[in-house]
């Protein structure tokens, strides 16, 4: 909002399609705001990027219908957790992945993650202080896959509660460590 005000001179209300928990990175985040600015739309992203921290980059700007709202019109969101499952970890990606040196049972995690698919009440997978009226959410796709020493947990759904994905990922790690049986998830 401050960067937009710097280039337009207007106070705007920025609506993002979602919030990110601490330590979570957003790729493909969509946001909208109303402006009377005369800056050409094809120059807007460049102008805003010149005022943002280096950790935030606007990829594209486009005009949308006045009724559009990034969060309310969002159809689905995907979260991906990356686990480095090597004994030593890596320094270069330490802010983008979680290092778990104990060998994880990926097959058990793959079995367990499927129990999260569908419409469920996820009240057991939300942090305290969650203000959502309902804890019912739909997960369209849930998967665990491995590439080398990295294990990926991906959840795509219609919305997520505060810390819900982090708690699900932690539960799947517990399954991978043999502390919880996959069949105990439902």
Located regions from the model:
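Structured-RNA-binding interfaces characteristic of tRNA pseudouridine synthases
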Residues: 2-186
């Amino acid at each position: 909002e401050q960067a937009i005000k710097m280039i337009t001179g207007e106070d705007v209300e920025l609506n993002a399609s979602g919030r990110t928990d601490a330590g979570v990175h957003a790729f493909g985040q969509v946001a909208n705001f109303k402006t009377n600015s005369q800056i050409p739309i094809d120059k807007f992203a460049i102008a805003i990027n010149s005022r943002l921290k280096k950790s935030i980059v606007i990829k594209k700007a486009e005009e949308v219908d006045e009724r559009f709202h990034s969060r309310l019109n969002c159809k689905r969101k995907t979260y991906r957790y990356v686990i480095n499952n090597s004994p030593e970890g890596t320094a270069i990606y330490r802010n983008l992945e979680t290092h778990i040196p104990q060998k994880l049972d990926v097959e058990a995690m793959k079995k367990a993650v499927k129990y999260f698919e569908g419409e469920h009440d996820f009240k057991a997978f939300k942090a305290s202080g969650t203000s959502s009226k309902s804890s019912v959410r739909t997960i369209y796709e849930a998967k665990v896959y491995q590439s080398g020493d990295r294990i990926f947990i991906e959840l795509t759904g219609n919305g997520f509660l505060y810390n819900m994905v982090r708690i699900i990922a932690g539960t799947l790690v517990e399954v991978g460590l043999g502390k919880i049986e996959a069949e105990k998830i439902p």
